[in-house]
């Protein structure tokens, strides 16, 4: 059956700021306390969405979350009106204010793990929300992510959206950023590669930075998504590269159809894994980048593998890269050798995503891949699909509500909270989502 990969990109939120909240993510730590530009960040993301949609790649948008998220501050013991809560937390514990104001939901590669209908036992598309247990600021995302996905994939005959796994370290799940699918045409059954960093009883794990994904979580997600057990491989990421800042697998590997583009040191027991994939995936091709050409350190600083590998109708592929790759002579030299070599990659497309990159999120972090048949695509909420009208409406919306300068101190401004709620009220109507945000359900909307 014919099917297409649709990229659902996260729209950057109004409180995008640099707080260094993500230990193990070196870009996040390095840019802590810099001044951010939320308006520019949102526009950089929108430009990528529109350019890819114009190039013929199906593209959609996932909206931001409500931030600052006051209900969690109340859970932490701050009381009074919303304004009083903001004032108290800013004075007594500003780090909590930064955490509940993070715009991290923009990295929707961590929103959920997807199983296309060709891979599932019941023939539905399954989406399991990630609990993002390893980081407090990200662990807040799951309930609203679930509401958003249910509003976008709202046909229960075709889509099953599963709640996140329990919030415990044993079941730490980071979503599609640790998941690859390999195979032939999108509509054919594929091999699902779940990548984890640690498992109970296995001493092979990183020592400097945390391994955010557990094997136990990956196995549970595969069960929830009803993936045919014959179509699943579990593989451990190389703990040494996690300790060098590769906090998700999508920082060191990217797949598309029959191709796995990865670093030579991406996986534990890599040669064994690649042999397994060759045996089980028709036409499988591994493009391994040697450490002698691109070091792990350069991989992390340029986000070479946090790229999108997209298929054209003729079978050729385009690699979507952040600008940092072009600015690094060694990485850019390697990429041009790759273009000249015998493989499906025939074009490099570069985007300026500096605002997101400075927090450790490249092109692949910003998108959730969902393989859909034509019938399934028609069942998706059409208001989220990118086109000229939506692009212009979202740009106008960003111009109206987003600030062009934000520091950690600005997060205490009650006007920022009011602006954010009004903006999301308008956006949820624009995208025909219903009342997906807690403030709307509590009657606190500004519509």
UniProtKB/Swiss-Prot annotation:
Active-site positions on this chain: 174, 248, 365
GO BP annotations, alphabetical order: arginine catabolic process; arginine catabolic process to glutamate; arginine catabolic process to succinate
Pfam families associated with the record: AstB
Keywords: Arginine metabolism, Hydrolase, Stress response
Gene Ontology molecular function terms on file: N-succinylarginine dihydrolase activity; protein homodimerization activity
Source organism superkingdom: Bacteria
EC annotation from Swiss-Prot or TrEMBL: 3.5.3.23
Conditions for induction: By nitrogen starvation, and arginine. Induced at stationary phase via sigma S.
Gene3D superfamilies in alphabetical order: Succinylarginine dihydrolase
Enzyme class: hydrolase
InterPro entries xref list: AstB_sf, SuccinylArg_d-Hdrlase_AstB
Pathway: Amino-acid degradation; L-arginine degradation via AST pathway; L-glutamate and succinate from L-arginine: step 2/5
List of residues binding substrate: 19-28, 110, 137-138, 212, 250, 359
Catalyzed reaction equations: N(2)-succinyl-L-arginine + 2 H2O + 2 H(+) = N(2)-succinyl-L-ornithine + 2 NH4(+) + CO2
Task of the protein: Catalyzes the hydrolysis of N(2)-succinylarginine into N(2)-succinylornithine, ammonia and CO(2).
Alphabetical list of PANTHER family matching this protein: N-SUCCINYLARGININE DIHYDROLASE (PTHR30420:SF2)
Complex and partners: Homodimer.
Family of the protein in this entry: Belongs to the succinylarginine dihydrolase family.
Name by which UniProt lists this protein: N-succinylarginine dihydrolase
Native source organism of the sequence: Escherichia coli (strain K12)
